[in-house]
Amino acid sequence: MDSNLRVTVWNEGRHEQTNPIVQKIYPAGLHQPIVTHLQKLGMNVRSATLDEPDHGLTPPVLSETDVLIWWGHRAHDAVRDDIVSQVQQRVIQDGMGLVVLHSGHFSKIFKRLMGTSCDLKWREAGERERIWVVEPGH
């Protein structure tokens, strides 16, 4: 077995298809700079996109992925529930890492794993915020 980290970078790919500015800056997709950088670090990296069969996340791809990087912004609802279930199983049962980027906090997979709506809420009241470090060595 290869000892290098196996990473799959997933991208919904919607901005590249609809925004000429994004197309010009990222002609190979928003995911490609991430793929290229991680490859330079010696990782085995592949990409997957929403428009591929099974969103590029077939069982063989998932079984050969140590870390899944997820980039999503506006096509969260287009991701099939059965694919979300497969990713969830790999994360929870098999220990696959998941790094969720940008607006991926609102993706189906992130919401399912967190068990919340993942709606962003905040207030600006000028109050002091306290953060407790309960496990400094973690």
Cite the ranges covered by each PLM segment.
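Short alpha-beta junction capping motif
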Residues: 62-111
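Glycine-rich, phosphate-binding/catalytic loops in enzymes
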Residues: 25-27, 84-89, 115-118
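Short C-terminal domain-edge/linker segments immediately following a structured domain
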Residues: 36-44, 79, 98-104, 129-134
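A structural signal for well-ordered alpha-helical segments within the folded catalytic domains
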Residues: 28-32, 85, 108, 134
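An acidic, glycine-rich "communication" segment
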Residues: 105-138
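Aromatic-Pro/Gly-enriched surface loop or interdomain linker
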Residues: 1-64
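Glycine-rich loops and low-complexity Gly/Arg-rich segments
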Residues: 31-35, 70-74, 93-95, 123-127
